[in-house]
Curated annotation (Swiss-Prot):
Species: Clostridium acetobutylicum (strain ATCC 824 / DSM 792 / JCM 1419 / IAM 19013 / LMG 5710 / NBRC 13948 / NRRL B-527 / VKM B-1787 / 2291 / W)
Name the UniProt record assigns to this protein: 4-hydroxy-3-methylbut-2-enyl diphosphate reductase
Pathway(s) where this gene product acts: Isoprenoid biosynthesis; dimethylallyl diphosphate biosynthesis; dimethylallyl diphosphate from (2E)-4-hydroxy-3-methylbutenyl diphosphate: step 1/1; Isoprenoid biosynthesis; isopentenyl diphosphate biosynthesis via DXP pathway; isopentenyl diphosphate from 1-deoxy-D-xylulose 5-phosphate: step 6/6
Co-factor note (free text): Binds 1 [4Fe-4S] cluster per subunit.
Binding site for [4Fe-4S] cluster: C13, C99, C193
Binding residue positions for (2E)-4-hydroxy-3-methylbut-2-enyl diphosphate: H42, H77, H127, T165, S221, S222, N223, S266
Active site: E129 (proton donor)
Sequence similarity: In the N-terminal section; belongs to the IspH family.
NCBIfam families the record matches: ispH_lytB, PRK00087.1, PRK01045.1-1, PRK06676.1, PRK12360.1
Function: Catalyzes the conversion of 1-hydroxy-2-methyl-2-(E)-butenyl 4-diphosphate (HMBPP) into a mixture of isopentenyl diphosphate (IPP) and dimethylallyl diphosphate (DMAPP). Acts in the terminal step of the DOXP/MEP pathway for isoprenoid precursor biosynthesis.
Gene expressing this chain: ispH
Keywords assigned: 4Fe-4S, Iron, Iron-sulfur, Isoprene biosynthesis, Metal-binding, Oxidoreductase
A Pfam family hit: LYTB
UniProt cofactor(s): [4Fe-4S] cluster
Enzyme's top EC category: oxidoreductase
Length: 642
């Protein structure tokens, strides 16, 4: 039984399809004969179909015969800079259908040629694409197919190397290796089109599995010829045909074989389908997908659906470093620049895959390269405004990312929409450095959403959410706090009258008098912000949200049994800790101080305590009196002096 297997990625590539669509569109717009500089693509059947639609190829020698305002279309292979300037100087209407990937190569060689680099092009020197590229570097490029013509490159050469988009990868690697062996400074751009390399790999794999391999495409088509060479190296029974009429009888009569089919980038679907149908012994249906008819049908059916602001669904047909190209079922393909997709610098080839469907918003009907310009960001923004308004009306939250700090607050982003957050709404406390929040994401509540003179003002608050969260936490903590509990807290603030200690989000006051049994002048003398300390809960006032704490309650009152510890008449050692006009205070133990009256300091008459004593001095004194109720101990230094 005969089996026909069609390779994936066979047929029209992105650049070729774009050129054909542009030719048909241009003819429709101008409604007169349109000229293409050279055959638009290397496929005789397509060229004939274009002629049927009043699109005719001419040679460079025919340019002088054109009249002002005649319309000429540059084919997908591109042309030299010199010829491009000639077309413009003649007053012609020039439509540039150069494949965008070829245009980028032209830009690269022009740039590096002007920077003094030797340009090397890997490819066929007679191919129109290579001729055109060479024309953008003053026709000075070294053209090498398999490593030849590189004799003038030396170790002192600065080289920029690019490739014909349809070149075989093995040729690129061979020439690149040779260039790097000769020159030290080499800038290389592998400009082989992804579609080309994928098509070649798939064709190579398929040719290993079949009895016959049929490669369909124009005999002048470079990429088709390379497909033939690749397949022929694996399958000896490989043939190159332009259409179904060239398929030989030995294949058609073989009833028991597997036939592989691939096609060059210039081969439309309807030619491929004719060939498959013939080899499969099926009649061609009247509903055969005709590439030309489809293109014209899309022009008619979708004209009214494409306008700035409309949302469209497209199928990804190509992904480059800077753009994503879509088939949007319209006379022009769509393009999404990277700037309209993502701000985070991600690789587009990691985000998108050829064949995926994507929805985007139209922001321009036609750019310089004749694409419909689309934006994912604008679609997200449109949806974002709806979600922000709903969040404002329903009092729900949104997660935003902080982008920059501005006067009076910060700017956050939600789906590309700027949202202002006042500085006073960032935290529950004052923030000195708002730059610390750049790049951070958090939930916010929308507190203002208004539109005036076509401008939308959006203000959000994080503090409102933090306040609600704090209230919930505090409510739980207040319900479990009781007098007499011992809990752990963190010192958050210090004042002259005490320290504020946070316990699971609730602030309590540790009064200066409750820090120690001894005298504390200032809380900062014994505590610092951030200290983790255990505290005793003195009182809990849930209604007024007041919490009183104590540290000294965690230790025994040193005045208990003081009469037994310090009997009257005993002599003790102590340290002078401070002076008063009437005497000196002496520390006997933590929390217990005694007073030496000025009259009990010395046998000599002194005007003030500091005349005889120094703060920090160790002294010996006699206990004159003790009162635990009044917390007083009277001392005398004079009575122990000899």
């Amino acid at each position: 039984m005969r089996k026909v297997m069609l390779a994936e990625k066979a047929g029209f590539c992105f650049g070729v399809k774009r050129a054909v669509d542009m030719a048909l569109l241009t003819q429709k717009e101008y409604n007169k004969k349109i000229y293409t500089l050279g055959e638009l693509i290397h496929n005789n059947d397509v060229v004939d179909k274009l002629k049927d639609n009043n699109v005719y190829p001419i040679g460079i020698e025919d340019i002088d015969n054109l009249k002002e305002n005649d319309v000429i279309l540059i084919r997908s292979h591109g042309i030299s800079e010199e010829i491009y300037k000639i077309l413009l100087s003649k007053g012609l209407t020039v439509i540039n259908a150069t494949c965008p990937f070829v245009t980028k190569i032209q830009e690269k060689v022009k740039k590096y040629n002007e920077l003094g680099y030797d340009i090397v092009i890997v490819g066929d020197k007679y191919h129109p694409e290579v001729i055109g590229i060479n024309g953008w570097c003053d026709n000075k490029a070294i053209i090498s197919k398999q490593g030849e013509n590189l004799e003038n490159i030396t170790s002192e050469s600065k080289v920029c190397i690019v490739s014909q988009t349809t070149e075989k990868l093995e040729n690129w690697e061979k020439v690149l290796k040779e260039v790097k062996n000769r020159a030290i400074e080499v800038i290389s751009f592998n400009t082989i089109c992804n579609a080309t390399s994928e098509r070649q790999k798939i064709a190579k794999d398929l040719s290993n599995k079949v009895d016959f391999m049929v490669v369909i495409g124009g005999k002048q088509s470079s990429n088709t010829t390379k497909l033939y060479e690749i397949c022929k190296s694996n399958c000896n029974e490989t043939i190159h045909v332009e259409n179904s009429g060239e398929i030989p009888e030995n294949i058609l009569k073989n009833k028991n074989c597997v036939i592989g089919v691939t096609a060059g980038a210039s081969t439309p679907d309807w030619i491929i389908e004719e060939a498959i149908s013939k080899m499969s012994e099926n009649q061609i249906s009247n509903e055969t997908n005709n590439e030309m008819a489809d293109a014209m049908k899309f022009i008619a059916e979708n004209e009214g659906k494409i306008y700035v602001g409309a949302s469209v669904t497209g199928e990804i047909i190509q992904v480059s470093e800077k753009e994503v190209f879509l088939n949007i079922n319209y006379k022009r393909d769509g393009v999404i620049p990277k700037s309209e997709i993502d701000d985070d610098g991600k690789d587009l080839k990691e985000l998108f895959t050829v064949g995926d469907k994507i929805v985007a918003k139209i922001i321009k009907l036609k750019d310089a390269d004749n694409y419909v310009v689309l934006s994912v960001k604008e679609l997200q923004r449109e949806q974002g405004y709806k979600e922000i308004k709903e969040a404002f009306e329903n009092k729900t939250t949104l997660n935003v990312v902080v982008k920059e700090d501005v006067k009076g607050g910060i700017i956050a982003s939600y789906k590309g929409i700027r949202i202002f957050i006042p500085a006073s709404h960032v935290e529950l406390f004052h923030v000195d450095n708002l730059k610390e929040y750049i790049g951070k994401s958090f939930d916010v509540a929308i507190i203002e959403y208004s539109t005036k003179k076509r401008q939308t003002k959006i203000v959000a608050s994080r503090r409102a959410l933090l306040s609600k969260e704090k209230e919930k936490v505090e409510e739980t903590v207040w319900n479990k706090l009781e007098e007499g509990q011992v809990v752990e807290g963190e010192v958050k603030r210090l004042t002259d009258f005490g320290a504020f200690v946070e316990i699971e989000g609730v602030d309590g006051l540790l009064h200066v008098s409750e820090i120690s049994w001894g005298r504390v002048e200032k809380p900062a003398d014994v505590l610092k912000i951030g200290d983790k300390i255990k505290v005793y809960v003195l009182s809990v006032d849930k209604e007024n949200k007041k919490l009183s704490l104590s540290v000294k309650k965690l230790t025994e009152n040193p005045w208990n049994n003081v009469e037994e510890k310090y009997p009257v008449g005993s002599v003790v050692l102590g340290k002078v800790i401070r002076f008063a006009d009437f005497g000196a205070f002496v520390k006997l133990e933590p929390g217990v101080d005694g007073l030496v009256h000025i009259s009990e300091i010395s046998h000599k008459r002194i005007a003030k305590p500091s005349d005889a004593l120094n703060v920090g001095e160790e002294i010996k004194a006699k206990i004159l009196e003790v009162s635990s109720e009044e917390k007083k101990i009277g001392l005398s230094i004079r009575e122990v002096e000899e």
